[in-house]
């Protein structure tokens, strides 16, 4: 996983974005370790489910249940809460 901190203008509507094994983090993220832990879950999801299949399933889930009830986001939020201390200093 490669983490790159980007300026706010490049990511004005969120704190993090994962594209396979690349994680973009907004420099203004309030809790960067949480955001990195959250996005690390998405890296794992991309890896386990597949490069083409994961984005398809993620978008399908997003349309069906919205962002807050998306199973992939729920899993990432839980992992972020439980493991954020492991990502301090990144």
For the regions a language model picked out, list residue spans one by one.
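Charged phosphate-binding loop/patch that engages nucleotide di/tri-phosphates or the phosphate backbone
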Residues: 1-2, 79-90
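Juxtamembrane/interface helices at transmembrane-helix boundaries
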Residues: 1-9
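Membrane-proximal topogenic or attachment-prone low-complexity segments at protein termini
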Residues: 2, 22-26
């Amino acid at each position: 996983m490669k983490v790159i901190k980007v300026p706010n203008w490049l990511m004005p509507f969120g704190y993090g974005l994962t594209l396979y094994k690349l994680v973009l983090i907004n420099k203004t993220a309030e809790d960067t370790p949480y955001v990195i832990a959250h996005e690390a879950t998405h890296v794992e999801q991309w890896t386990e489910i597949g490069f083409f299949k994961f984005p398809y399933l993620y978008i399908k889930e997003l349309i069906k249940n919205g962002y807050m009830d998306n199973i992939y986001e729920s899993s990432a939020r839980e992992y972020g809460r439980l493991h954020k201390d492991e990502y301090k200093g990144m």
